[in-house]
UniProtKB/Swiss-Prot annotation:
One of its GO terms (molecular function) is ribonucleoprotein complex binding. Transmembrane segments: none annotated. The gene is nop7. This is Pescadillo homolog. Residues 351-467 form the BRCT domain.
Length: 676
C-alpha cells in the first residue's frame, strides 16, 4: 500500500515561502531583509492559488520563491548585517553607561562597511547587461541630484549623485552619443546610444521641490546606494574604453560657483608615456648584445605610435577629419514603387556631433542653462556663453560679444516704450545690454528650436522660433504617426480623405444658413414675448374682471375660426408671391446692371457651384457605399474567426479615423478664424 502524501511537501506549498518564514530562516530583521532583496534583485511573487501556497489561514501574505531565499543563505552581506547588529548593541550599551567616547570610537572604527561590488558582478555578467539596466538607475540618480537636502536625504548622497551624473554627461558629450530629447510635463526625456544599446532616462525640471512625508525614503535610499555603485562601474568602463582617466579632475571651487559641467576636467591616458618607456627599454637593449629584442621593442614602439596617430602631421589629420565628416550615410531606396519601403539608418555620431559646431550660443538668464548646455555640447557646440549670475564656465559673459551667432531667448517681445532701462554696470564688470534689444547679425530663437533640431537631425528655420512667434507643435520623437492618424506637422490637404473638405464646407454653409434663418425667427419670438407681456399687464390692470368688449372679441374670433379653410390655399399663394417677388428683384438687378454698363452676375453661378459640390459629395458617398457593400460580400466568404478579427480591426480603425477627423475639423476652424 502506498504511503499517504504529507501536506505541504510538494507543489505550490513547497515552491513558495512567506516573508515571515524567509526572515526567520535568514535570521535578520525585516529592514535588512528588504535591503538584501533590493541588492540581489529578488522580488515578491504571486502564486496561482494562495490557499495552496500558504500554510496559514491569513490570506494577505507576501510570497517569495523558496529557491531565491535558499540562494540568499550564502550571501556574504548576511555576515555584514549581523556584524552591524552586534556593533549597534555595543554602541547602545556604551551610551547607556554614559561612555560617549567609546560609542563614537566603536561607530568610527568598528562599524562594518558594505561593498556591493560582488553583487554588481553577479547581476551583470557582461557590460551590455549593465547598460540595459541603466534606464532606472539614471532616472533615480538624476532625481536625487535635484532634491534639496533633508534629514532623509543627506547632502553627501546628493553630491555623489550629481558627480556621477555629470561624469556620465561628459562621456556623452565626448562621444556624441546623445540622440534625442523631448520636453514633457514630467520632465526632460533623453535617449543615448552606447555600444548599440538605446538608453532612455528622465530628468526633472529644476523647480523648488517640496519633500512629502508619504514617500518611504529608506527604500529609495537603498536603491540609490545600489545604483550609485552600478553607475560608478559603468562610468569607469566607459571612460576606459575611450582612453580617459577615471575619475576626472573635479574643481570644488568652480562647482561652488555654479560651473556644473565645467567643474570637471577630462584627461586622456598619454600614449607618449608608454612610447617613452618602450624607448627606454629599447636603449637598454641596444647596450646589450641581444639585437633581436631591440628589434621587437622598436616594432612595438612603431605600432603604438601608429595606432595613436603620432606619426602623422596636423595637415594629414585635418584632411582625414574632413574626409570622415563628408562621408554620408547610404540611403536604401526601393527598386519598384510597389515594393516595401526599407527602414533608413539614423544619422551617425559624427554628423550629430557637428550639428551646432560652427555656431556660438548665448543663453539668456530666463532660459534653462543646464539642459541647453548639455545638449549643445553633446551636438558639437564648443562656445557657449551666459550671464555671470548663472555661474562659471562660460565661453563669454559679455552679451554684446560679436562672436555670438545665436542667442536663446525665452521672453516675449515687448514694445520699445515698455523695455526697462539699462542697468548700471559696476567698475571692471562686463557692460550690460538693455533687456529686449536686438543686436544686428545675430539669430534670436526660443529654446524649443534646439530640441526640434536635434530630433529632426538638421537645422530648422529659425524664423519659426523667433521670440514672440507661435511655436510649432513639439512632438515626441519616439511616436511615429501611423496611417490614418492625425499628424499636426503635416498640412490638412495631405491628411484629408477624399471629399472631406467639400463635406466640411457644405456643413459650414448649412450652419451659416441656419444661423441666418434663426436670426429673424428670434426677433419674431422676442416681439411675441413683448406682446404677451403687455397683454399680461393689461389683464393685471383689469383685475380679472370681464370687460364689455370681451364678448365682441370672442364673437370675432369665432367668425375667424369659421372662415378658416386650411393652409393649402394660403401656402400656394405665398409660394407664388415669393416666386414673383424673386423674379421681379432679379429683373430689377438686370436693368440696373445694364444701365450702369456692368455685367450682371446672378446667383446662378453660386447655385451651379453648390450643385457641383453636392454632386461630388453624392459621388463620394456612392463610392463609399459601394466599397462597404464589396467588403460585406468579402466578409461573407470568411470564416467566423477571421470575420470577428476583421471586425475588431475595423472598429479600432474607425475609432482612430473619427478622432483624427475631429482634430482635423478643429484645426480647419482655427485656421479659418486665424485668416479672418
Amino acid at each position: 500500500m502506498a504511503k499517504i502524501k504529507k501536506k505541504g511537501t510538494s507543489g505550490q506549498a513547497k515552491n513558495y515561502i512567506t516573508r515571515t518564514q524567509a526572515v526567520r530562516k535568514l535570521q535578520i530583521s525585516l529592514p535588512d531583509f528588504r535591503r538584501l532583496c533590493i541588492f540581489k534583485g529578488i522580488y515578491p511573487r504571486e502564486p496561482r492559488n494562495k490557499k495552496k501556497a500558504s500554510k496559514t489561514s491569513t490570506p494577505n501574505t507576501t510570497f517569495y520563491y523558496t529557491k531565491d531565499i535558499q540562494y540568499l543563505l550564502h550571501e556574504p552581506l548576511l555576515r555584514k548585517f549581523r556584524d552591524q547588529k552586534a556593533v549597534a548593541k555595543k554602541i547602545a550599551r556604551s551610551l547607556g553607561r554614559g561612555e560617549v567616547g567609546d560609542a563614537s570610537r566603536l561607530e568610527k572604527n568598528h562599524a562594518p562597511k558594505l561593498t556591493l561590488d560582488h553583487i554588481i558582478k553577479e547581476r551583470y555578467p557582461t557590460f551590455i547587461d549593465a547598460l540595459r539596466d541603466l534606464d532606472d538607475a539614471l532616472s533615480l540618480l538624476f532625481l536625487f541630484a535635484n532634491l534639496p537636502s533633508t534629514s532623509h536625504v543627506p547632502p553627501k548622497t546628493i553630491a555623489l549623485c550629481q558627480r556621477l551624473c555629470h561624469e556620465f554627461q561628459h562621456y556623452l558629450i565626448t562621444t556624441n552619443s546623445l540622440r534625442k530629447s523631448f520636453l514633457s510635463i514630467k520632465g526632460i526625456y533623453y535617449q543615448a546610444t552606447i555600444q548599440g544599446q538605446d538608453i532612455m532616462w528622465l530628468v526633472p525640471y529644476r523647480f523648488v521641490q517640496r519633500v512629502n512625508g508619504d514617500v518611504d525614503y529608506r527604500i529609495m535610499a537603498t536603491f540609490v546606494e545600489f545604483y550609485t555603485t552600478l553607475l560608478g562601474f559603468v562610468n569607469f568602463r566607459l571612460y576606459s574604453s575611450i582612453g580617459l582617466r577615471y575619475p576626472p579632475k573635479f574643481d570644488t571651487r568652480s562647482d561652488e560657483n555654479g560651473a556644473e559641467l565645467a567643474a570637471f576636467t577630462l584627461e586622456g591616458r598619454a600614449v607618449a608615456n608608454a612610447a617613452k618607456t618602450i624607448e627606454g627599454s629599447n636603449k637598454q637593449s641596444n647596450n646589450s648584445s641581444n639585437q633581436e629584442v631591440s628589434r621587437d621593442v622598436q616594432a612595438k614602439v612603431d605600432k603604438v605610435i601608429k595606432t595613436a596617430g603620432l606619426d602623422k602631421t596636423k595637415d594629414e589629420q585635418t584632411v582625414e577629419a574632413t574626409d570622415e565628416n563628408t562621408d554620408a550615410i547610404d540611403r536604401f531606396e526601393p527598386a519598384a514603387p510597389e515594393a516595401d519601403t526599407l527602414p533608413q539608418p539614423d544619422i551617425s555620431g559624427e554628423e550629430a556631433g557637428a550639428l551646432f559646431a560652427p555656431f556660438t550660443f548665448y543663453i539668456s538668464r530666463e532660459a534653462p542653462k543646464a539642459p541647453l548646455e548639455f545638449i549643445l555640447r553633446a551636438f558639437g557646440c564648443k562656445r557657449i556663453g551666459w550671464d555671470a549670475v548663472m555661474g562659471d564656465g562660460a565661453f563669454t559673459h559679455n552679451e554684446a560679444d560679436t562672436r555670438i551667432t545665436h542667442q536663446i531667448v525665452d521672453r516675449p517681445s515687448l514694445p520699445e516704450g515698455a523695455l526697462p532701462a539699462v542697468p548700471a554696470a559696476k567698475e571692471g564688470a562686463v557692460p550690460a545690454v538693455r533687456p529686449g534689444t536686438r543686436i544686428p547679425g545675430r539669430t534670436y530663437i526660443q529654446p524649443q528650436w534646439v530640441w526640434d533640431c536635434i530630433n529632426e537631425g538638421k537645422l530648422l528655420r529659425p524664423d519659426l522660433y523667433a521670440p514672440g512667434e507661435t511655436l510649432p507643435p513639439h512632438l515626441s520623437p519616439w511616436v511615429k504617426p501611423s496611417k490614418g492618424a492625425y499628424d499636426p506637422r503635416a498640412t490638412l490637404a495631405e491628411q484629408e480623405e477624399e471629399g472631406e473638405a467639400e463635406m466640411a464646407g457644405e456643413e459650414e454653409e448649412e450652419e451659416s444658413d441656419e444661423e441666418m434663418e434663426e436670426a429673424p425667427e428670434t426677433k419674431k419670438a422676442d416681439a411675441k414675448a413683448d406682446e404677451s407681456e403687455s397683454e399680461d399687464e393689461d389683464e393685471s390692470v383689469d383685475g380679472g374682471m370681464d370687460v364689455a368688449d370681451s364678448d365682441d372679441d370672442e364673437s370675432e374670433s369665432g367668425q375667424e375660426e369659421e372662415d378658416f379653410g386650411g393652409f393649402d390655399d394660403n401656402e400656394a399663394a405665398s409660394e407664388s408671391e415669393d416666386e414673383e417677388e424673386a423674379a421681379r428683384t432679379q429683373h430689377q438687378k438686370e436693368l440696373e446692371a445694364e444701365a450702369a454698363g456692368l455685367p450682371f452676375s446672378s446667383n446662378g453661378a453660386t447655385d451651379d457651384a453648390k450643385k457641383k459640390k453636392s454632386s461630388q459629395a453624392k459621388k463620394i458617398a456612392a463610392k463609399k457605399r459601394k466599397e462597404e457593400e464589396e467588403l460585406e460580400r468579402q466578409k461573407m466568404m470568411m470564416s467566423r474567426k477571421k470575420r470577428k478579427l476583421l471586425e475588431k480591426m475595423m472598429y479600432s480603425n474607425k475609432k482612430q479615423s473619427e478622432e483624427a477627423a475631429k482634430l482635423r475639423s478643429k484645426r480647419r476652424k482655427l485656421e479659418k478664424t486665424g485668416e479672418k
